[in-house]
Amino acid sequence: MKSARAQPDAPRLLAWLPLLLALLFSAVTLLPELRAVANLNDDAFHFLLVQGADGALSGGANPFDFWSPVLELGFPQFLYYQHLPHLSIVLMQRLLLGHVSLITVFNLVRYLLLVGFPLTVFWSLRKLNFSHAGAITAATLAPFFAGNFGYGFEYDSYVWRGFGMYTQIWAMHLSFICLALLCDYLERGKNRVPAVLALAALILSHLVYAYMMAISAAVLFAVGLTRSNARQRSLRFALVWTLSALITCYFWLPFILSKVYLGASPYLQRWKYDSFGAQAILQRLASGDLFDHGRLPVMTALVATGLLAAALTRTRQAVLAGALFVTWLLLYFGRVTWGSLLDLLPMHECLIMHRFIGGVDMAALLLIAVGAGWLWQFCGRWQPGRQTPVFVLLTLLLMLPALVERHGFYRLNDVFLDRSARAVDQDEGAATLIERLRTLPPGRTFAGLRTDWGKDMKFGDLAFSDLLTLNQIPAVSAPYQSLSLNADLLWDFDYRNPDDYLVFNVRYVVAPSLEPMPGFLKRLQTAGRYTLYEAESGGHFALGRSDLAFEGRQSELLGAARAWHARALGAAGEFPRVALKGMQAPPSDLVSLPLADAPRQLGGFAAPPLPAGSIAAQSAQSQRYSASVQLQDPAMLVLKVSYHPNWQATVDGVPVPTVMLLPSYIGIELRPGAHEVVVAYRSQTVRNLLIAFGLALLVLLVVLARPRKTPGFSRWP
């Protein structure tokens, strides 16, 4: 009896072999990603956010909205940046009772998400009613995209030598899960609450992919639309998106209302906004370079097979896959092809269209499932009794070029990672100075940029500034994301100019010991091949004046700030007021000049003498700064951190307004006399109320999803 029952199970077990091999391959080749090494890519930024959320929670601050002082002269990243993936790490580490370090949990979650991606693809495709053979094949090939660092599903986007796009790993999983659950709800009315939760999680994990999911969901909605189901399908579609939007409104609503304080770097390459155009993308697709860079175009061939099968079979799954692929391929062409037509898209002005490759990759996996299912049927007609072995052999043969290419890629990744890890471990001087910096009084640290000797302070592929980020040491360094309005001005910092140390509050410098340094720097310590210097920075506060006022667009701010910096007006104590379009600036007696005209206006401006007075004492914490000030003249007290209205100031215990000053600093007007000034970061009350509302709605949905005897709830659309 046992052998008779086991016999039909043998082909089914054999069919899983390619997927198991893919999982094992990823599990082994990605093991180096578990090493606790500083990151040289955006994962350094992501882990800094994890550390910041953990510190905020430990210190009694709001983990959903806190000030991070380390990069870009400070910024409240979680107010604008997707944060569920980061908060999840903090929660997991606490569930482990702190026995496992944050960086270990961070790397482990990254590793498991990368290794487990095929399982999410398989589950989602089966939920979408793709064939078993097609789902297994697509899941098997899911981790084997090779796009030559194209920012898509290829693991080049995630590994140590890649881009470190941690939140996109979550978005890959959630995009498939959302599509599957949405389909289930729209078609059968099942999984309403899981669909809402998945969409909400995607919104909080990756805004661009949530935007892309809205477009994919519209395609899904249209593919299954008939005259008989139009009303019910429309109600379900509207309900699931409305509920997910309400749950996450604490994030996207304040984001929209205060986006004027979010930087938009002019240094970001134009192709990231515009994409590459139809000709370049179609050439890459036809040559196999889009999915199979540097190897035989096996995935490209399966995508082509899927397109052919979709045209011939026209099943619901085939039509969905084909429609999604065409939609995303057309959108991926970007502004180079479509020009002003793309202005019809919501939020078109801030779309980074090169990331639409993610939609192309997701649709490609659906087409691979269609094509593989078609080949499975062909194998059944060709070899009726050997359908499974023949198909498995074909799949393994198709995997071989991908396995060879990916193995070479990951081996080089391991070489780079190991080289850098050993260099850091063997460099005792760097560790000594990092520990010294932890004990020194507050002040930012400069360890070079890519435009000066900073490029020579390397540990394999890591820079010294990467170690500063890992150790949460506030620094003037190359921006990772350019979220702050001050971020791009940091490229203008000149270590040879003593004024810049005052303007940016750079108190410490780490430089190569053999590098000639300016005489105004005081040597504190030499360790190994580095020397630590101290400069006169004036601290986080400065006394100044504000004799000019400008008003204009955010895009005009950097030009004004660079002109102000070039004229050394900050060191002279002149900090003009700035009101950006969309800001609510306090009233002023000054006449506002056009911000676009600031470079000309500042070029001929002579700063008046500094107001008489002094800063007797000052202190700095991550969420709070304070100063004791003695003034003989009216003055503007300047806090040299990025301006944001969530900073609330009190003078002698009385709340006072703050103003935005060039470059994007905080200003507080003071009268003559002795004053105690406190400036603290406070999350907006409305955002905290929206968080409570979202959590309450989430709990309510879960409760209502439980089986009930009351019939009314079961008749939701």
Give the ranges of each region predicted by the language model.
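Short, charged/polar, Gly/Pro-enriched secondary-structure boundary elements
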Residues: 352, 537-544, 637, 674-678
